[in-house]
């Protein structure tokens, strides 16, 4: 009888020990889980705080890249046209640039072109630029600049061009600068003015200027096939309506590459 009671007592002791061990395991598991969860929560909270501390300007490049990618996909799917990709910009230039406005391709308020315009007429548009506060500034001058032989001035064409661009940056210091190369005229038009044959010289200066200042040089000259492409009006200088989508796509491609 005593043995049976002893055996029963030992069984109870073993059961209590097992229960105790299980309780300890459960407590340890709970503590580990709680600690691990707290670390994840703390990490999440730290990330949120870090994001909140970031200024809007710091987040803007990331958001802009995402927006550009979404727009590129939409354009590839035929939901947008190339002109929709021009955003928060101004486009300065001569009568060639005015075609973007005249044909209804771009916002007239943002196309700051002039008939007979030269790089020296940037001053005429500084008030508009200050009002619009664009983040992208596109420039396309050259034909009239060559006609006026601006390269003969002190410091050459690049010096004059750079001075004018810096006037813009004094107003919108964070704007990205995009400089279109000069597109040559046709060989027939060149016969009317030998000055227009300086495209290569002027473009070399523009390219070097952009490299020096970390601006983006856009090679548009290649679109002309040395003046033999079917892109010109009868005067051999101005462009057909059909050329503007091609020109616009070249500009947007360069913009996306520069900002990617």
Label each residue range with its predicted role.
Residues 1-86, 102, 258:
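N-terminal secretory targeting modules
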Residues 76-160:
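Conserved SGNH/GDSL esterase-like catalytic core that processes O-acyl groups on lipids
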Residues 86-88, 132-137, 172-177, 212-216:
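Loop/turn elements at helix/coil->beta-strand transitions in domains of secreted/extracellular proteins
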Residues 93-96, 104, 143, 181-184, ...:
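A mature extracytoplasmic/lumenal domain signature
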Residues 140, 144, 169-199, 224:
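Active-site segments of SGNH/GDSL-like serine hydrolases
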Residues 154-164, 195-202:
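Charged helix-capping and loop-helix junction motifs
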Residues 185-260:
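Catalytic His-Asp segment of secreted/periplasmic serine-dependent ester chemistry enzymes
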């Amino acid at each position: 009888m005593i043995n049976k009671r002893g055996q029963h007592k030992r069984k109870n002791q073993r059961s209590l020990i097992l229960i105790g061990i299980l309780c300890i395991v459960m407590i340890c598991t709970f503590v580990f889980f709680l600690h691990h969860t707290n670390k994840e929560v703390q990490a999440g909270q730290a990330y949120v705080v870090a994001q909140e501390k970031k200024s809007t300007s710091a987040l803007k490049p990331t958001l802009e890249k995402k927006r550009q990618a979404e727009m590129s996909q939409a354009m590839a799917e035929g939901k947008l046209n190339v002109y929709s990709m021009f955003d928060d910009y101004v486009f300065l230039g001569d009568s060639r640039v005015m075609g973007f406005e005249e044909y209804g391709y771009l916002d007239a308020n943002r196309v700051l072109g002039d008939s007979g315009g030269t790089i020296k007429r940037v001053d005429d548009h500084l008030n508009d630029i200050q009002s619009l506060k664009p983040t992208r500034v596109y420039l396309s001058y050259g034909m009239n600049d060559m006609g006026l032989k601006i390269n003969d001035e002190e410091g050459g064409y690049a010096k004059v061009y750079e001075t004018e661009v810096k006037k813009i940056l004094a107003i919108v210091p964070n704007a990205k600068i995009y400089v279109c190369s000069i597109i040559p005229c046709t060989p027939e038009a060149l016969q009317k003015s030998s000055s227009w044959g300086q495209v290569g010289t002027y473009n070399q200066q523009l390219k070097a200027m952009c490299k020096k200042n970390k601006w983006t040089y856009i090679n548009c000259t290649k679109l002309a096939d040395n003046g033999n492409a079917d892109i010109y009006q009868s005067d051999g200088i101005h462009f057909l309506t059909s050329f503007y989508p091609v020109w616009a796509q070249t500009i947007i491609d360069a913009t996306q590459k520069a900002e990617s």
